Amino acid sequence: MDTRVIAVLFVAIMVLSSTNALPKQKGSYKNMNHADFLKGLDRASSKRDCRDSHWSCFFQSNYEDICSTAQAEECALSCGLCE
């Protein structure tokens, strides 16, 4: 191929990608804005902190059925694990 053809193709691809004409991947971390990413981290860490503070409830029940175990249900609901 001629170098001019390659250059034109390269410029065309760059223009299309900058104007959002090319399809983007859905569900990619690249499409997530920074605020949503930080909210997800905050939610995960707050659930982990809550679980750590109620560790005795979680320790006494099986993790798989934590939302149906009466002993751990209050802790799980307060931590937002059984939404």
Curated annotation (Swiss-Prot):
Entry keyword set: Cleavage on pair of basic residues, Disulfide bond, Neuropeptide, Signal
Expression by tissue: Expressed in various neurons (ectodermal sensory cells) (in planulae and primary polyps). Not expressed in nematocytes.
Keyword Disulfide bond: yes
Propeptide: 22-48
A GO biological-process term: neuropeptide signaling pathway
Disulfide bonds: C50-C82, C57-C75, C67-C79
Post-translational modification: Contains 3 disulfide bonds.
Keyword Protein transport: no
Superkingdom of the organism of origin: Eukaryota
Extent of the signal sequence: 1-21
Start and end residues of each ShKT domain: 50-83
Role according to the record: Probable neuropeptide.
Protein's name according to its UniProt entry: Protein ShK-like4
Native organism: Nematostella vectensis
Record lineage: Eukaryota, Metazoa, Cnidaria, Anthozoa, Hexacorallia
